[in-house]
Curated annotation (Swiss-Prot):
Annotated effect of mutating residue 507 to G: In strain: LN2012-58
Keywords of this entry: Disulfide bond, Fusion of virus membrane with host endosomal membrane, Fusion of virus membrane with host membrane, Glycoprotein, Host endoplasmic reticulum, Host Golgi apparatus, Host membrane, Host-virus interaction, Lipoprotein, Membrane, Palmitate, Signal, Transmembrane, Transmembrane helix, Viral attachment to host cell, Viral attachment to host entry receptor, Viral penetration into host cytoplasm, Virion, Virus entry into host cell
Protein name: Envelopment polyprotein
Record-stated family: Belongs to the phlebovirus envelope glycoprotein family.
Transmembrane stretches, start-end: 454-474, 1037-1057
Keyword Zinc appears in the UniProt entry: no
Lumenal topological domain residue ranges: 20-453, 563-1036
InterPro entries, per the entry: Phlebo_G2_C (IPR043603), Phlebovirus_G1 (IPR010826), Phlebovirus_G2_fusion (IPR009878)
Cytoplasmic-facing ranges: 475-535, 1058-1073
Golgi retention signal: region residues: 475-521
Annotated site (Cleavage): 562-563
Length: 1073
C-alpha cells in the first residue's frame, strides 16, 4: 500500500513493506527547484532527510507544527493521524523509529506482568501495540479485553464507549527512543567495568525496575527516572549520564530508498529488483554497492535509488571505553532512591553531667564520646572537641567569680545533639586569690590582713639594704676611678711641665739677667703645689639613708580612675487616674535612652508618679551580644556537576550536510540530544569539524561534524542558599520585663527596632565593629541538611571564578533544575576539548561542598569565633576570641504604657549582710541585702557611684544586687527607697581586683560595651593606701610616715643587732687566739 501526503512546502513518503520496512523520506516538492528548509530547532537538514532511528519523532513534530501526515509513531501532536491502521500495530513499534519494525526480531519482548504502565495501573490483556525498555529487557504493552487503543496511542477506551469515551486510570505512560543495530560482543570483565562506572555516576539509586543497582540502607518508593542507556547483551542495561556517541557509515540494502521521479516510491518488488540485479539508476554509493544501469532510457520509467541520509551505526564512548551496543536509547524507568535516616536532633543527653573545676568545668558523657561542645558561663564561652567521655573545658583565666549559670550545647559521636544547663560556684572575693607574694597578692592587699604588713616590712628592709649596697658600690667606683685617673693626671702634668720648660728656654735667649731665671723658678714651684692639691682631692661621703623616703614618697602618690556603670532613667510623662482600692492607673508615653549593659546585666527605666510613693521599673536584661551578618541580596547555588556530550556525523549525513550548519548556535540541540537533556537547562552548544573518510567510518572524505554541548546539572538536588554579608553589626538577645511583670525575649539587630510589645519598642544602637577579613564572607546554608558554613563568595550578579556563587539562581526550584531562565553562569566554567571523534570536558566549578566542609560552623576567622545562631536575625553569630569593646545604647519608645501604682507607703527596713566580688570589673560587686517589707514594692538603692532598682516581696527576704565600685575597700552610706520609705544602709566589705581575663585555647567571649567597666584598669597606689590605712588623705600621710619611721627604726635595730653580734664573734675569736 502506498500513500502520498502533501504538506506546506514538504512532501513525505511513507512506505509499508511486507518484509523489510523502508525509511521515511522528507524531500522538496518535485514541482519546485527550491530546496525545502526545516527551521533548525532540533537539527538542520535540506533536500533529502530521514527521521532516523534516534530522531525523536515526537520532538520533530512538535517543532514542525505545519506537518499533517501519517507517521508510524504512537504519540505526537493531536492533529497527526497514525499509519498504518490500528490492526497493524503489532508490526509497528512506536518505540523504535518508523519503518524499522524488523528490528523487533533482534529483541526478546516479554508480556507485561500485572501492570500495563510504569506507574501502578490495571492489568492489560490482549495484543501488544508497543514496547517499553526495562532495566533488564523489553516489555510489550496492550489494552485489556473489551478495550481498544485510541487514535493518539496514549489511552485505552472501551469498545462500547462511555459518555467521555475514556476510562479513568488507563493512561499509558511512556517516554523514550531507541536505536538497535548489530552488536559487537564485549567480555564479562568489560561489562563489569562499565557497570561499576555506571554505579559511580548514580550512587543514590538503589533499584531500577525492581532490580538492585546499589546497596542502600533505606530507599524511597519507585518513581519515574529518565535516563540514557545502552544494551550490551548482558544481564541488564548500562545506564549512563555523561557519554559520547559517533556514527559510522556501513551500507546495506536497507540503507537505500528507491523511487520514481514524479511518481513516488517504487513498489517492493521493484525495489528488491533494483538492489539485486543492478538494473536501476542511483547515486555513487548505491552504484558502488549494487551496481547501476547506464543508458538514455527515460528516467520516469526506472527507479532511482539513493543512500538514505541517516547517521549510520552508533558507537558509544563511556567510562573510557568504546562499545557498539545492541541498542542505544533514552527512556523512562522506575527507580528507588537512597533515603538517609534522619539524624538525631537536639534533645537531652542521658548520663551527661557537669563537674566544676578551677577556671572551667569538666563535662562527662557516659553514653558516648563527646564529639564537640560549646559551654558558656556568663558572657565567656569555650568550645572543645574531645572524642572522650570526660572532657575538661577552660574559660578565660580569672574570668568567673561567684555562682555562675552554665549553658552546654554539644554533640556526641553517635550523632546525638544535646543541650542542658547547670551552675557552678566559683571562688568569690578574696577566696579567688589563693597565693602568697604573687601578682594577685600585690593587687589585692586587703585580702591579707597579716601577710601584707610582713610584705611591707620585707620590702622596706630590702629597699634600705639595696640603697646601702648602691651607695657602697658608688663609693667603690669613685675610689677605683681615682686609681685609674691618677696616672693619666701625672702624664698630663709632665707634658705640661715640659712645655713650660721649653717656653722658659726660649725666653732666656731673649731676656737677660738672673731675675728672669728666678721668676721662672718661682712659677714652677706654684705649679707643683697645685698638682699636689689635685692629687690629694677626695670625694665626699654620701649619706645613703636620705634616698629611701624620697623614692617611696614618689611611688605612693597617684590618682584613682573611675568607670561608667549601669544607670536607670526616670520618666515624668505620666498621666494618672484613681483606680480601685488604693491604686492609681497611669498611662505614660515617651522615649528614653538607656546605656547598654553587658551580658547578664540589666538596664532599668524607672517610672514614678506625683503623689505616689510607689514606683515601677521597665527592665532590659542583656543575655548575649554577638556580631550578626547584615545580609545583602541572597541567591541559591546548585551542587553543580559539569556534563558534556558529543555526536559525530559524517558529511552529508543527518544534520551535517555541507559542514557545520550555520543555524547551529549556542542554544541549538542536536537531534541525538532531544530527549537526553532539558532544553530549558543551562548549557552551551557548538559544532566543530572532525575527521572524515573511510578511516573514520565515513563515505565522504570531507570533514565530519562534531556536534557538542556542555552543560551543568544538579544530580543530587542539593541546594545552597548563599547570603553575602554587607557588614557585621552587633546584635543583642534581650529579655524585656514590663512593669507588670510580663517577660518577652527579643533579638534586636543594631538599628532595627523590635516589635511593639504592650506599647513598648526597643532599638539597640550598637556601633559597628571593624574586623579585617570579614567583608567578603557569606552565610552558606545547605537547605536539606541545614549545614552551615562561612566562606568568601560572589556578590549577587557577579560570577568571579574561584569563589562560591559562580552559578547563581534566583529561586530554590531553579537551582534544583538549573534552568537557564532562572540562573546565570559563566560558560567558561566548563571547558571543552575537541578530539578526532568526540569532545571531552573539564570542570572549573568551585565545589560548594568542599568549601562548606572546610569552613563549616563552628569556625574561627580573623580573631572571631563563629557559631550557629538559633534566632531569626541571621543563622551565624560571631564572638571575639579576646576582649573587644563596642559602644551601644538602648532607645526605648513607649506609647500608652500602663502602670498600676500603689498610694500606700510601704514599711521597709533592712541591712546589708555582705559585700563581695570585684571592683573595676565587668560583673561588678555583689551586694546582699536583707529587707523586711509590708507589701510588694520596688526598692531603689543609690550609692555615691552607682544605683540600682529591684523588686521587693512582702515579708522578710534576702536580695543580691550588682553595684559597681572603683576602689577595693568599701565603706559608705547608701540611700534605700523601698515603696516610698526612705532609709540608709551601710556597705562595708573588701573587693578584689580581677586581672584582665586572658585568652585560653578554645575560649572566646561575647562582645561587651565599653561604657561599662571592663576590668582593664589596674589598681592605683590609692587602692593600696585604702587597703592599708583606710580612706582619707590624713590617714594616708600618717600611715606612710609611720611606716617609714617604723621601718627606719626596725632597720637600725637590725643593724645594731648585727654589729653587736659581729663584735661578740670577734671577741670570742680573740680570746681563743
Amino acid at each position: 500500500m502506498m500513500k502520498v501526503i502533501w504538506f506546506s512546502s514538504l512532501i513525505c513518503f511513507v512506505i509499508q513493506c511486507s518484509g523489510d520496512s523502508g525509511p521515511i523520506i522528507c524531500a522538496g516538492p518535485i514541482h519546485s527547484n527550491k530546496s525545502a528548509d526545516i527551521p533548525h530547532l532540533l537539527g538542520y537538514s535540506e533536500k533529502i532527510c530521514q527521521i532516523d532511528r534516534l530522531i525523536h519523532v515526537s520532538s520533530w513534530l512538535r517543532n514542525h507544527s505545519q506537518f499533517q501526515g501519517y507517521v508510524g509513531q504512537r504519540g505526537g501532536r493531536s492533529q497527526v493521524s497514525y499509519y498504518p491502521a490500528e490492526n497493524s500495530y503489532s508490526r509497528w513499534s512506536g518505540l523504535l523509529s518508523p519503518c524499522d519494525a524488523d528490528w523487533l526480531g533482534m529483541l526478546v519482548v516479554k508480556k507485561a506482568k500485572g501492570s500495563d504502565m510504569i506507574v501502578p495501573g490495571p492489568s492489560y490483556k490482549g495484543k501488544v501495540f508497543f514496547e517499553r525498555p526495562t532495566f533488564d529487557g523489553y516489555v510489550g504493552w496492550g489494552c485489556g479485553s473489551g478495550k481498544s487503543r485510541t487514535e493518539s496511542g496514549e489511552l485505552c477506551s472501551s469498545d462500547s464507549g462511555t459518555s467521555s469515551g475514556l476510562l479513568p486510570s488507563d493512561r499509558v505512560l511512556w517516554i523514550g527512543d531507541v536505536a538497535c543495530q548489530p552488536m559487537t560482543p564485549i567480555p564479562e570483565e568489560t561489562f563489569l567495568e562499565l557497570k561499576s562506572f555506571s554505579q559511580s555516576e548514580f550512587p543514590d539509586i538503589c533499584k531500577i525496575d525492581g532490580i538492585v543497582f546499589n546497596q542502600c540502607e533505606g530507599e524511597s518508593l519507585p518513581q519515574p527516572f529518565d535516563v540514557a542507556w545502552m544494551d550490551v547483551g548482558h544481564s541488564h542495561k548500562i545506564i549512563m549520564r555523561e557519554h559520547k556517541t559517533k556514527w559510522v557509515q556501513e551500507s546495506s540494502s536497507k540503507d537505500f530508498v528507491c523511487y520514481k521521479e514524479g511518481t513516488g516510491p517504487c513498489s517492493e518488488s521493484e525495489e528488491k529488483t533494483c538492489k539485486t540485479s543492478g538494473s536501476c539508476r542511483g547515486d555513487m554509493q548505491f552504484c558502488k554497492v549494487a551496481g547501476c544501469e547506464h543508458g538514455e532510457e527515460a528516467s520516469e520509467a526506472k527507479c532511482r535509488c539513493s543512500l538514505v541520509h541517516k547517521p549510520g551505526e552508533v558507537v558509544v564512548s563511556y567510562g573510557g571505553m568504546r562499545v557498539r551496543p545492541k541498542c542505544y536509547g533514552f527512556s523512562r524507568m522506575m527507580a528507588t532512591l537512597e533515603v538517609n535516616q534522619p539524624e538525631q536532633r537536639l534533645g537531652q543527653c542521658t548520663g551527661c553531667h557537669l563537674e566544676c573545676i578551677n577556671g572551667g568545668v569538666r563535662l562527662i558523657t557516659l553514653t558516648s564520646e563527646l564529639k564537640s561542645a560549646t559551654v558558656c558561663a556568663s558572657h565567656f564561652c569555650s568550645s572543645a572537641t574531645s572524642g572522650k567521655k570526660s572532657t575538661e573545658i577552660q574559660f578565660h583565666s580569672g574570668s568567673l567569680v561567684g555562682k555562675t549559670a552554665i549553658h552546654v550545647k554539644g554533640a556526641l559521636v553517635d550523632g546525638t545533639e544535646f543541650t542542658f544547663e547547670g551552675s557552678c560556684m566559683f571562688p568569690d572575693g578574696c577566696d579567688a586569690v589563693d597565693c602568697t607574694f604573687c601578682r594577685e597578692f600585690l593587687k589585692n592587699p586587703q585580702c591579707y590582713p597579716a601577710k601584707k604588713w610582713l610584705f611591707i616590712i620585707i620590702v622596706i628592709l630590702l629597699g634600705y639594704a639595696g640603697l646601702m649596697l648602691l651607695t657602697n658600690v658608688l663609693k667603690a667606683i669613685g675610689i677605683w676611678g681615682s686609681w685609674v685617673i691618677a696616672p693619666v693626671k701625672l702624664m698630663f702634668a709632665i707634658i705640661k711641665k715640659l712645655m713650660r720648660t721649653v717656653s722658659c728656654l726660649m725666653r732666656k735667649l731673649m731676656d737677660r739677667g738672673r731675675q728672669v731665671i728666678h721668676e721662672e723658678i718661682g712659677e714652677n714651684r706654684e705649679g707643683n703645689q697645685d698638682d699636689v692639691r689635685i692629687e690629694m682631692a677626695r670625694p665626699r661621703r654620701v649619706r645613703h639613708w636620705m634616698y629611701s623616703p624620697v623614692i617611696l614618697t614618689i611611688l605612693a602618690i597617684g590618682l584613682a580612675e573611675s568607670c561608667d556603670e549601669m544607670v536607670h532613667a526616670d520618666s515624668k510623662l505620666v498621666s494618672c487616674r484613681q483606680g480601685s482600692g488604693n491604686m492609681k492607673e497611669c498611662v505614660t508615653t515617651g522615649r528614653a535612652l538607656l546605656p547598654a549593659v553587658n551580658p547578664g546585666q540589666e538596664a532599668c527605666l524607672h517610672f514614678t508618679a506625683p503623689g505616689s510613693p510607689d514606683s515601677k521599673c521597665l527592665k532590659i536584661k542583656v543575655k548575649r551580644i554577638n556580631l550578626k551578618c547584615k545580609k545583602s541580596s541572597s541567591y541559591f547555588v546548585p551542587d553543580a556537576r559539569s556534563r558534556c556530550t558529543s555526536v559525530r556525523r559524517c558529511r552529508w549525513a543527518g544534520d551535517c550536510q555541507s559542514g557545520c550548519p550555520p543555524h547551529f548556535t549556542s542554544n541549538s540541540f542536536s537531534d541525538d540530544w532531544a530527549g537526553k537533556m532539558d532544553r530549558a537547562g543551562l548549557g552551551f552548544s557548538g559544532c566543530s569539524d572532525g575527521c572524515g573518510g573511510a578511516a573514520c567510518g565515513c563515505f565522504n572524505a570531507a570533514p565530519s561534524c562534531i556536534f557538542w554541548r556542555k552543560w551543568v546539572e544538579n544530580p543530587h538536588g542539593i541546594i545552597w542558599k548563599v547570603s553575602p554579608c554587607a557588614a557585621w553589626v552587633p546584635s543583642a538577645v534581650i529579655e524585656l520585663t514590663m512593669p507588670s511583670g510580663e517577660v518577652r525575649t527579643f533579638h534586636p539587630m543594631s538599628g532595627i527596632p523590635t516589635q511593639v510589645f504592650k506599647g513598648v519598642s526597643v532599638t539597640y544602637l550598637g556601633s559597628d565593629m571593624e574586623v579585617s577579613g570579614l567583608t567578603d564572607l557569606c552565610e552558606i546554608e545547605e537547605l536539606k541538611s541545614k549545614k552551615l558554613a562561612l566562606a568568601p563568595c560572589n556578590q549577587a550578579g557577579m560570577g568571579v571564578v574561584g569563589k562560591v556563587g559562580e552559578i547563581q539562581c534566583s529561586s530554590e526550584e531553579s537551582a534544583r533544575t538549573i534552568k537557564k531562565d532562572g540562573c546565570i553562569w559563566n560558560a567558561d566554567l566548563v571547558g571543552i576539548e575537541l578530539r578526532v571523534d568526540d569532545a571531552v570536558c573539564y570542570s572549573k566549578i568551585t565545589s560548594v561542598e568542599a568549601v562548606a566542609n572546610y569552613s563549616a560552623i563552628p569556625t574561627t576567622i580573623g580573631g572571631l569565633r563563629f557559631e550557629r545562631s538559633h534566632d531569626s536575625q541571621g543563622k551565624i553569630s560571631g564572638s571575639p576570641l579576646d576582649i573587644t569593646a563596642i559602644r551601644g545604647s538602648f532607645s526605648v519608645n513607649y506609647r500608652g504604657l500602663r502602670l498600676s501604682l500603689s498610694e500606700i507607703t510601704a514599711t521597709c527596713t533592712g541591712e546589708v549582710t555582705n559585700v563581695s566580688g570585684c571592683y573595676s570589673c565587668m560583673t561588678g560587686a555583689k551586694v546582699s541585702i536583707k529587707l523586711h517589707s509590708s507589701k510588694n514594692s520596688t526598692a531603689h538603692v543609690r550609692c555615691k557611684g552607682d544605683e540600682t532598682a529591684f523588686s521587693v516581696l512582702e515579708g522578710v527576704h534576702s536580695y543580691t544586687v550588682s553595684l559597681s565600685f572603683d576602689h577595693a575597700v568599701v565603706d559608705e552610706q547608701c540611700q534605700l527607697n523601698c515603696g516610698g520609705h526612705e532609709s540608709q544602709v551601710t556597705l562595708k566589705g573588701n573587693l578584689i581586683f580581677l586581672d584582665v581575663p586572658k585568652f585560653v585555647d578554645g575560649s572566646y567571649m561575647q562582645t561587651y560595651h565599653s561604657t561599662v567597666p571592663t576590668g582593664a584598669n589596674i589598681p592605683s597606689p590609692t587602692d593600696w593606701l585604702n587597703a592599708l590605712f583606710g580612706n582619707g588623705l590624713s590617714r594616708w600621710i600618717l600611715g606612710v610616715i609611720g611606716v617609714l619611721l617604723g621601718g627606719l627604726a626596725l632597720f637600725f635595730m637590725i643593724m645594731s643587732l648585727f654589729k653587736l653580734g659581729t663584735k661578740q664573734v670577734f671577741r670570742s675569736r680573740t680570746k681563743l687566739a
